[in-house]
């Protein structure tokens, strides 16, 4: 897939998101093989691997998490790539800038790609002739082979672990937990990619998983974003592009590949492990698709081919671009209408707002409204004081994320960077910043 696609230019830094599962393990080993000198269509980018420890969100104890990391430790250095092990608790120390959509570099043309290949080969030839590092791309990675020798032995802060556990325990439904976990994981990987200079992120989503994801997202109200959620490339983040090179392989093909080439993998319990079939929308869609696949073997491929026909287009036309408002969580363009719009969603929003408004007493109508922020207090602290905090967050969310946020009783457990960015956007809209 990567040999045929010219999305990744020679010399680019690519971060491989490895979860320990079969698909992501197969992806890492195929990239390792593609970077070798014996490969027919040799890959020419610089790779790194990241592993996110999600044990706290799944209810694992410190001993269970340490056991998982002990299984991960010998696999990552064996790849020869720079690797990073991060805990999901680190989302509580992320800056609000992780939710900003940075400017995206223009896509290079066919001639630009060929020129980049020639320049890369010439540079490799000069390095080889000068007695520098070898020509094997996998052996000339400038970063060190590990992120931090103590990173595996140092557990995250206890306060952050408790905060993450409290956040996921407060979510009512498993569907909302799965979506929240995916969102926080994406934000953390995106921050690590930007911090270490990676311009691409590869995920191990297989054809089977993408077919399940397509049907799930349709049920979750994310139909407007299917091209980004299931496509080969996802450019919603701007400077970091998410690539899905495993989308042409089914889970069965991945299992055969891992068996034939002895690809190691690590089982890590997920938030829906041992959950019943009807516990969440994703679990229900997974059982539905896999059950159909056993009776009709073309089910997965048919759903997958449907996703290939989806076209990425801004909601307000090509002129909308990066200036259009984006969702605070999934970072897609907002797909909701205003309360006064002539749509079903607009009517529901207007009805909800009218129910929230309470009748104002006669004595209060004669009192002029005071300033939003009290004297001596910064604007950032009092901009949303007179508004419903839940409404301040909801106005910056897409339809699907709004539905999921209804399963979160309180906004207090959310990571600070999400609340800070929501407050900043509200102030910017009201003109206080």
Language-model segments: what does each one mean?
Residues 70-74, 78-87, 102, 300, ...:
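PTP/DSP superfamily signal
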Residues 62-67, 72, 182, 293-306, ...:
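Ankyrin-repeat TPLH-centered helix-turn motif and closely related helix/turn capping elements
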Residues 1-232, 236, 248-251, 260, ...:
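ATP-dependent adenylation/nucleotidyltransferase module used to activate substrates
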Residues 199, 203-210, 245, 249-308, ...:
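Mid-to-C-terminal catalytic subdomains of enzymes
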